[in-house]
Amino acid sequence: MAAGIIDHESGTRDIRKLSGLIKLMPYTATLAMVASAAMAGVPLLNGFLSKEMFFAETVFITSTAWVEAALPVIATIAGTFSVAYSLRFTVDVFFGPKATRLPHTPHEPPRWMRVPVELLVLACLIVGIFPALSVGPLLAAAAQPVVGGTLPEYSLAIWHGWNAPMIMSLI
C-alpha cells in the first residue's frame, strides 16, 4: 500500500528514480518504514513473531538428515533476503538527495489514502507487542479444525530466549 501511495504521489514506483522522500512525505515515510521493518522481522513487530515461528518449524522438523540440515540454512538465507529488500526499499526511497526528475512533485497523500496503511501498521505493532492477546484466540480457532483434537502446546510470546530461531534471526 505504501508503494501505491508513493506511485500515486510521485508518478513512479521505479526505485531507481526515487530518493529523499522522507523530506517531502515524512508521515508516509514513517508508516512505510515501520511496515518495512515488520517485513524484515524486526522485534516488537508482527514480522518478528512470524519469522521466529517459521524458523522454529524449520529447526524442529523431523525428516531425513539432509532435510533437517538444509531447511534451517535455506530459511535463514530467505530471511536475509527479507531484510535486504526491506532495507533497500527504505534507504533508496526515503533517504539520500531529493529526486529531481519525477513526473509529479511528491507530497503527503489525502487522509483516506493513509488510513488503510495506518491500520495495518497499528496491527503490526499490536501483534508484535501483544501476540498472545491479539492473535492467540484466532490461531487456536483456526488450528483446532485442522488438528482435530487437543492442540499441541505452543507459545506466542515476544521472547523465547536464546535459541536456534533467535540465532537464525541475528544472522
Set out the residue ranges of the language-model regions.
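Alpha-helical transmembrane segments and their helix-start/interface "positive-inside/aromatic belt" motifs
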Residues: 23-32, 107-123
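Alpha-helical multi-pass transmembrane bundles of energy-transducing inner-membrane proteins
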Residues: 1-15
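Predominantly late transmembrane helices and immediately cytosolic-facing juxtamembrane segments
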Residues: 68-108, 168-171
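Glycine- and aromatic-enriched alpha-helical transmembrane segments of multi-pass membrane proteins
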Residues: 114-132, 158-171
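Membrane-interfacial helical/loop segments at transmembrane boundaries in membrane proteins
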Residues: 53-61, 134-161
